[in-house]
Structure formats: C-alpha cells, structure tokens
Amino acid sequence: MSYLFEILPSLLSGASMTLQVFALVLIFSIPLGVLIAFALQVHWKPLHHLINIYIWIMRGTPLLLQLIFIYYVLPSIGIRLDRLPAAIIAFVLNYAAYFAEIFRGGIDTIPKGQYEAAKVLKFSPFATVRYIILPQVTKIVLPSVFNEVMSLVKDTSLVYALGISDLILASRTAANRDASLVPMFLAGAIYLILIGI
C-alpha cells in the first residue's frame, strides 16, 4: 500500500498533463469542427474539395502518424514546434475533422423548410444558424460528440510518443524503475476514472 502512495504523485502529475492536453484539444477542436461543418454548407466547389481532402487525410491516417509528421517531419521544411504545441496541433486537426463530420451529419438532418422560414422571418444567415439551426444540431449530435470526447481521453496517451510527461510516460517510468506492473494498472484505473467523469 505504501508503494501506491509512493508512485501516486508522479502518476497524478502525468494525469494533470493528460487533462491539460484533453482540455486544450477540446476547446479548439469542437469550434473548428463546427466551422468546418458549416463551411461545407457553402456552395463553392473548391472549398468543398479542400475540406473533403482534409477530412479524408485526417480520418484516414492514424493519429500517431500525424503526431510524428508534425513533430519530426515539419522541421525538415523549417517549421519547428515544441512537443506540447505539436501534439495539440495534431490532435486539434485530427479531432476537428471528426467533429466536422458529426456536425455535418446533424446539419443535414435539419429540414430545408426551417431555413426558408427563417428567411421569411427576415433572420440574417448568422441569426438563422445561431438561434434555429445550431440548437437543434447540438441536441442531435450530443451522443456522438460524447463518444468522441471519450475517445479523446484515451487517445491522449499517444503524446507519450513525443516524450511528453503524461500519465502513460509516468506509469511506464515507474514500472521500469521498480520492475512492477502496479503503475500500469494504476494508470489504467485513472483512465477509467477520467472516462467515467
């Protein structure tokens, strides 16, 4: 039992970094995903093609590969990022693509008559989206968004690949140092608690 109290501070420090990555990604990826979803409603083919290519790449390649690309490959063309910003950018770009598809699906379920009614009532396009479309879309997509949020909690463990001191790195360090699997089990329990919250 004393061993648990010995390793707990480093694991909680790692969990703090995990939560920081999670919060930053969530704060930036959901609004970006919503913007992308509404941009897909604009009837301009070049924009549609660019967004669809972006979504195809982000959803079709592993997040780990995207992390490695942003942190290790971009410096070869002169773009250097520290570990944490590189991880945040990779996660935001990846999750924004998923959120964009979720919100696009929600937007597509709204009947066209609602847009026409808003036009008759002289709502501006912004007011139509803000007061009529977005509240309904939010209600529709909430279960899917929560599923992605739970995936994000688990995916934050990938920042370990960049050497960021998250929960996984802290537990692995303790496990290697002490030749014990207890830190890994404790990390798993912390992830379960985070997902349960």
Q: Where in the sequence are the language-model features?
A:
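Transmembrane alpha-helices and adjacent helix-loop boundaries
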Residues: M1-I197
